[in-house]
């Protein structure tokens, strides 16, 4: 089916008055940082990428590579360094802030820090030390609707965080540029009902990752506007893949499923396409939609999906004059 126009938000923070505005092209944004760039022989200053996941994954690698190539073509002189937080499942979430500060402290000459992924965003935006708040930062490759990373005293399997707008937290930090997106749950519900007007129940699947829990929190926040729809949350923090499949077989009639993400289950086991295959066989008559593009084209009927691609070129044109 033909998809609606994707929605993508690009934002910049003016340092003096802290007001947000939508931007398309900002070639002069970082003039104070790059107009007097030194040669590598004169300075060890660098641009530091901090990725939430392995930088060798195609999506992350392509965006970093596009940035570096275009940055050089536009005359950038600073070296680019990539560090990886190696974030996986939520069982290690309490370590993420310490992992991030170790990376930042390792690179005191970073002229600019580029945070890629929700784990990196949320970890950074909950650092209280003023030295981190003053770092010039770009944020990309994550939804604006995130969660607070749990503290040591919080049991991750029962943690029920509210969805928070991370772009609001950015006002306390030196975030110069933010490329983000937002899942439009209202449009997804509208699409489901247009196909299945008898829909009475929503099934939402999410996994044992930061993105999974952030998506679940965002869906919960939106579903309060639909009291007529009951909801089942199949949660990878408490479910193995087999347990999730069994729960899917027992959903009420007139249910419609909305896919978030299922990459890692409660045991920390990582799944690729085999999880989609298992879910699709569990309840073949259940209509399925996707808010993340997962399974669209071979299992999910459709969904209102943000635009994820093209981040590299957007960032690099704001990094060099």
State the predicted function of each range.
Residues 43-59, 202-205:
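Short beta-strand segments enriched in small/hydrophobic residues
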Residues 149-186, 297-313:
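Short beta-strand elements at the ligand-binding edges of bilobed clamshell
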